[in-house]
Amino acid sequence: MGQMVPPRSIQNEDFWKNPWDVGGLTVIGLFTSTFLLFVLFAVVFGYVEKAVFEEE
């Protein structure tokens, strides 16, 4: 009979055990979220200024 192959983990355990990899991923995530937050503020305040000028 055939042998069952043990299921492989989706996440590599070696990656999560290395603090440099986790730290690098954290920094990349923070930069990305900060950039998206700046874009969101630019869009929101840009539209607010346009709406104020149109009312006057």
UniProtKB/Swiss-Prot annotation:
The chain crosses the membrane at residues 25-45. Coiled coil: none annotated. One of its GO terms (cellular component) is endoplasmic reticulum membrane. It comes from the Eukaryota. Keywords: Endoplasmic reticulum, Membrane, Transmembrane, Transmembrane helix. The keyword Cytoplasm does not apply. The keyword Transmembrane applies. Homooligomer. Can also form heterooligomers with other sarcoplasmic/endoplasmic reticulum calcium ATPase (SERCA) regulators ARLN, PLN, SLN and STRIT1/DWORF. Monomer. Interacts as a monomer with ATP2A2/SERCA2; the interaction results in inhibition of ATP2A2 Ca(2+) affinity. This is Endoregulin. It comes from Mus musculus.
